[in-house]
Amino acid sequence: MHKSKKPIGFWSAVSMGIGAMVGAGIFALLGEASAISGSAVYISFIIGGIIALFSGYSLGKLGARYPSSGGIIEYLSQSYGVGIFTGTMGVMLYFAAIVSLSLIAKAFGNYAVTFLPETEKLKVWQIFFSSGVIVLLVLINLEGAKDVALLERVTVGIKFAVLTGLSIAGIIFLNPDLLSPSHYPPGNDIFFSLAITFFAFEGFRVITNTAEDMPNPSQTLPRAIMAAILLVMLLYVAIAFAVFGNLPVEKVIAAKDFALAEAALPIFGQVGFSVVAITALIATASSINANLYAATNVTYQLAKDGELPSAFGKPIAHSREGLLVSGVLIIALSLLFDLSEIAAIGSISILFVHTVTHIGHLKIISETGASRILIFIAALLSFSAMVLAIIYVSKASSHVLYILSGFILVALITEVSLRKIAKREIKTRVI
């Protein structure tokens, strides 16, 4: 088992989970989600949070029994054994993580350009900032797990302080009429928005990748996952009330690339806009930081088990070569997709992997000691949310389904190809 000399404790793990979730959830996707569910987006966040809690319970139990830096990849190996199916799911999970990071990097660039004069807000600057933050955080992650955890504790503290302040002020000054159910869209749209809002929670899985760096993962891992999801769900709901209680839906959608900063304008003026925009930069950087740690652990696990060439698992400085490969892929993908497409592809992919993981958990539930009913509910909720997301995407952006199909096909082809390159077999952990 790979062990870091710099262990990760409960609060460090919680901070990493929060950092991974909040960057994508509020700063990158609030505007996109509001375009579907309007001022009822808080309901969608609650539903997405409930699904995440059940998934978190399942992954927490698996992680307690099979602590591994590979997280879900290890759980799939234990449930389904070795083979092309498990390997394809692992490659798909890695690709989904890279796509997610490209979304967050793009969000960082969107907020960064708000500080430029109107005449200088060119696409080239958005690309520059998006790529630059990836390069910087790859270098930071090369220093090892403790440095990642330390940065998360600092950034999460700043982020929570500003967002809590904005939430409290927004709720104090909110206009109840703006939150009236009469402004809500049809109920179907609220459920369809799960295609976006669940993606706001999917970052919690990065906590599973810290298991090998935890002194006592059997106790720390499950508690850290549940704590992170609950705190983030409360934060999302509070912010949704604050934003939509002060801005009409149309304004939120119009400023969807920097919706939270726009929401601060009527309460705090231009200073508030700038403070929230700076916080957005910190939050998205924090999310990239936490997710990069997970991505490099995924490549390590894949390389260790023979799914990627061994070069991916070679240490560079205090981290792994897979981190550098991931950084290059993230920058490339951030240039190819827009936010809504990335969110839909990422959300459906992750929900599919979660569904498969929970079903597999039922096969080995005697090993983990989890509740069969709760795991069944986790699988059912993940599957239902995935179906709803597919239905919505097929109506709103049918071309995304073709991209998603291609995404799965590429994962399968990559898996088969890498097996030939690596010339090794996957071996599950023996515990």
Where are these regions (language model features)?
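Helix-loop-helix junctions that connect adjacent transmembrane segments
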Residues: 1-4, 42, 119-127, 153-277, ...
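TM-loop-TM module centered on a large, flexible mid-protein loop between adjacent transmembrane helices
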Residues: 72-82, 114-118, 226-289, 307-339
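A generic transmembrane alpha-helix motif of multi-pass inner-membrane proteins
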Residues: 362-366, 370-431
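Alpha-helical transmembrane segments
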Residues: 308-314, 355-373
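Membrane-interface "cap" regions at the ends of multi-pass membrane proteins
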Residues: 1-31, 36-39, 53-57, 416-431
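Select transmembrane alpha-helical segments in multipass membrane proteins
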Residues: 7-17, 50, 81-96, 129-133, ...
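Hydrophobic transmembrane alpha-helices that form the core helical bundles
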Residues: 32-36, 44, 53-134, 138-142, ...
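Membrane-interface loop-to-helix entry segments
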Residues: 112, 125-173, 184-187, 225-226, ...
